[in-house]
């Protein structure tokens, strides 16, 4: 993946924007920005938009949102990015699964170094794991619950002895998961 080459990202900030950003929730944007460090960037930032302002208003009701909107910054027209500008068609990204213990291990030509879900085949599972410091937010846990529910609804079961671990990003996330029945 050209956009993630170390010589383009090392010690730089990665800025995410454009129409695809509108399809990402605030939690997904936080994960995207946190993962920028995985390809050697110092940080990641997203353009300010209504998704951000709505989250700020919900989480920080004491803020003057008119003032916050006026304080938002955007890239200058014609800004130069030393690592380049990369356009990624989000609709072309396929679902991925990382290998246990080493998310960098996998099919080398794919941009996230995981394995394509439809190419994995039959795999004996003894431990299932969801979450992480960057993928343990409310949206992430909701997705895990949706996948588990869809599997259950289609008649799939978990073999006896398979352990399932969920790493919540915070106690608040765990509390939400428990209250919505996702933890079970």
Question: Regions from the language model: what does each represent?
Answer:
Residues 1-184:
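Fe-S-dependent hydro-lyases/dehydratases of central metabolism
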């Amino acid at each position: 993946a050209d956009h993630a080459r170390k010589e383009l990202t090392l010690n730089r900030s990665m800025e995410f924007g454009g129409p695809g950003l509108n399809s990402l929730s605030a939690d997904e944007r936080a994960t995207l920005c946190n993962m920028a460090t995985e390809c050697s960037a110092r940080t990641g930032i997203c353009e300010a938009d209504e998704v951000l302002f709505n989250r700020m208003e919900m989480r920080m009701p004491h803020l003057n949102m008119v003032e916050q909107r006026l304080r938002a910054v955007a890239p200058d027209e014609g800004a130069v990015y030393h690592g380049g500008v990369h356009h990624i068609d989000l609709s072309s990204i396929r679902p991925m699964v990382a290998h246990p213990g080493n998310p960098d291990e996998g099919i080398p030509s794919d941009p996230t170094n995981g394995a394509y879900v439809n190419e994995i085949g039959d795999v004996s599972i003894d431990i299932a794991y969801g979450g992480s410091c960057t993928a343990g937010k409310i949206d992430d846990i909701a997705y895990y619950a949706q996948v588990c529910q869809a599997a259950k609804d289609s008649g799939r079961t978990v073999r006896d002895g398979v352990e399932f671990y969920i790493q919540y990003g915070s106690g608040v996330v765990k509390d939400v998961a428990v209250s919505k029945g996702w933890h079970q």
